[in-house]
Amino acid sequence: NSIHDMDREKLFEKFLEDCKNRKEWCGQGNPNADILIIGQESTDISEEALIRNIMLCRDKKDRDAPRPIDPKNKTWANYQELLDEIYCRKSEYIDKWDFEKFAFTTELSSTPRKQRNYKEAKPSIKERIVFFKDSDFIQDFSVIILACGGYIKNDDKVREIDNTFHVEFCKEYGSKESKNRFWTHIDKKDPRKLVIHTRQFSNGISKDLIKEMASVIREHLRKLGLI
């Protein structure tokens, strides 16, 4: 059986068990969404936070519920803007983010930035990339946004994105001088999957990048009959 024929909830339960055993952040949002966003790192991954995170993911009623807006969290504000652009909508709430109904989010590093430097975290990031490569849950999304900058790369020597997500580079968007660029990748054998690599969605991301990326994703989802 193709993994696409399996129940996503079953794939998700296996992913949660694996994260629990590895003592890693699993993520949050709607595991049955069409869009997966992989950021750089979580802010709090104490043992208590990891346990709370898994409990929340198993709570089907609350796991993708609207969350109060945190003015300091620029990343989530930009995720909300992207999902609103993709689905041509606006949040139903003045004081809450509700993008998690439309996406699942997780992180490429399971060590908070404040506790280490990139060099120290690199081995665990590499292990997590292998974990994602082998995860049927991660691979099952129609759109995967790698919003984690240089934590994963494709260059002349290393084709981490291609190898991890079974895709090939397709097109570059944005100006070469700008930090606001993104790259698309597709699986030529199964064009159902679109992988986008870009910078972190924190401070400095442009409205133009969000709009252009949303347009590319919307067109992909339309082709698949998902919008």
In which residue ranges do the predicted regions lie?
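C-terminal capping/extension of enzyme domains
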Residues: N1-L16, E120-K133, D155-I227
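Active-site and ligand/interface coordination hotspots across diverse enzymes
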Residues: N1-T75, R128-S135, R181-K189, R222-I227
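Short, solvent-exposed loop/turn segments at secondary-structure junctions
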Residues: E41-I45, S109-R113, G149-N154, Q200-G204
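Surface-exposed cleft-lining segments at the edges of enzyme active sites
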Residues: K61-T75, S109-K126, Q200
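Acidic, metal/cofactor-coordinating or nucleic-acid-engaging core segments within structured domains
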Residues: A65-K96
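Short, contiguous, well-structured surface segments enriched in hydrophobic/aromatic residues
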Residues: D95-R113
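Proline-aspartate-enriched helix->loop->beta-strand connector
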Residues: K133-G150
